[in-house]
């Protein structure tokens, strides 16, 4: 879809409202992971550099529709200043007199952060009056929070209809990367989908089999597909009540010309813990008292051969219990293969989802993928083929 970017805006002397995602982890009053701030910084610095008054809006945590110190964005100010290399003023509210006064007090080229949008119950209800009050604070609206774009809230959707609107640099990068990966991909496309349950990724799987040429399944959800094929799964995590849905996905894949790749071998252990004694055997040889905690080397080799023919890879979810060693080796190995092919310019690789980012960072390859999305829910809904309200509202 067509959308405006910062290139289409004239911002000098204007007040620009930027919806960012500053919902970052805080421990002992300090931001423990600044990734989202670092990714938002280029948009804020560009606007400030062009002489705009930059006004940042964001949610933080899950307050109950009223102010509370634990969920105040004030604690994010030092980390945001460090990410920007600029001082950041703070307003005690995101609408009303305190917000107006804080914006009036800054000069063009300066930045002010407004208090948590979710301190107003109307934010999550997409209350038109709250959106109107926010819009009254500025001249232009820029959405740079793809990670919140799946929510139709006052600061992500409502406000975009009330002001000239554009995508920030992070939103632009996300939309362009995702467009290349699924909307207009170079084929063949391989999707790697892992994680514990198919029940949480049913819509995603049903959509993906119609869009991709190969679907690699890993993690606990692969066991559900193996079970649906009548193969033994021991005491592995498997949603046996989802066998019919798994068969329906396989039938839809066959009708769509999508090849499903399931584990051929695995690391079988009797208990779920780091360093648990295990053996690597073909999936058919799992014992009744064993669980498959990772894919084995034969599976990695098989996926690697298939990867040689791919031009685009979309990754969501680990291949095994990556959080406990040595059951991260399957995820690490496949991720390493994708990273190497990306580095050689042979594939475009896009990954996203919370566990996925953590797994790729643990494997040391996150920086070697073409694009790693910081969006969790929004990335998943996009993979499900759903329209994202925050993106749709930017439509040019």
Curated annotation (Swiss-Prot):
Pathway given in the UniProt record: Carbohydrate degradation; glycolysis; pyruvate from D-glyceraldehyde 3-phosphate: step 2/5
Residues where ATP binds: 201, 323, 353-356
A matching Pfam family: PGK
EC number: 2.7.2.3
GO terms of biological process kind: gluconeogenesis; glycolytic process
Enzyme kind, highest EC tier: transferase
Main location: cytoplasm
Keywords assigned: ATP-binding, Cytoplasm, Glycolysis, Kinase, Nucleotide-binding, Transferase
Reactions this protein catalyses: (2R)-3-phosphoglycerate + ATP = (2R)-3-phospho-glyceroyl phosphate + ADP
Localization per Swiss-Prot or TrEMBL: Cytoplasm
UniProt binding sites for substrate: 21-23, 36, 59-62, 118, 151
Top-level lineage group: Bacteria
GO molecular function, one term: ATP binding
GO cellular-component term (any): cytosol
Subunit note: Monomer.
Protein name: Phosphoglycerate kinase
Biological classification of the source: Bacteria, Pseudomonadati, Pseudomonadota, Alphaproteobacteria, Rhodospirillales
């Amino acid at each position: 879809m067509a959308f405006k970017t910062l290139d289409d805006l004239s911002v000098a002397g204007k007040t620009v409202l930027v919806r960012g995602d500053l919902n970052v982890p805080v421990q002992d009053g300090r931001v423990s992971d600044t990734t989202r701030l670092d990714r938002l910084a280029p948009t804020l610095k560009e606007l400030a550099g062009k002489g705009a008054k930059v006004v940042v809006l964001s949610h933080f945590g899950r307050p109950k529709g009223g102010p509370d110190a634990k969920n105040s964005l004030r604690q994010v100010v030092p980390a945001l200043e460090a990410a920007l290399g600029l001082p950041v003023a703070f307003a005690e509210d995101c609408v009303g007199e305190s917000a107006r006064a804080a914006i009036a007090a800054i000069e063009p080229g300066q930045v002010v952060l407004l208090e948590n949008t979710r301190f107003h119950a109307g934010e999550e209800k997409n209350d038109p009056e709250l959106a109107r009050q926010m819009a009254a604070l500025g001249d232009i609206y820029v959405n740079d929070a793809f990670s919140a774009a799946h929510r139709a809230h006052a600061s992500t959707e409502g406000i975009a209809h009330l002001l000239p609107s554009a995508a920030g640099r992070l939103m632009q990068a996300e939309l362009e990367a995702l467009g290349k990966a699924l909307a207009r991909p170079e084929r063949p496309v391989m999707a790697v989908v892992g994680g514990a349950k198919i029940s949480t990724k049913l819509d995603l799987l049903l959509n993906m089999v119609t869009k991709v040429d190969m679907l690699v399944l890993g993690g606990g959800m692969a066991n559900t597909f193996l079970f649906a094929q009548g193969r033994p799964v021991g005491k592995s995590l498997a949603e046996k009540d989802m066998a019919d849905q798994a068969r329906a996905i396989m039938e839809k894949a066959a009708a769509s010309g999508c090849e499903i790749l399931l584990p051929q071998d695995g690391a079988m252990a009797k208990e779920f813990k780091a360093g648990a004694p295990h053996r690597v055997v073909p999936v058919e040889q799992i014992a009744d008292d064993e669980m498959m905690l990772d894919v084995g080397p034969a599976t990695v080799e098989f996926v690697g051969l298939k990867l040689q023919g791919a031009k685009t890879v979309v990754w969501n979810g680990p291949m095994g219990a990556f959080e406990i060693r040595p059951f991260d080796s399957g995820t690490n190995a496949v991720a390493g293969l994708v990273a190497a092919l990306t580095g050689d310019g042979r594939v475009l690789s896009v990954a996203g989802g919370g566990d996925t980012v953590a797994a790729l960072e643990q494997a040391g390859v996150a920086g070697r993928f073409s694009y790693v999305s910081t969006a969790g829910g929004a990335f998943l809904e996009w993979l499900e083929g759903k329209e994202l309200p925050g993106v749709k509202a930017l439509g040019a």
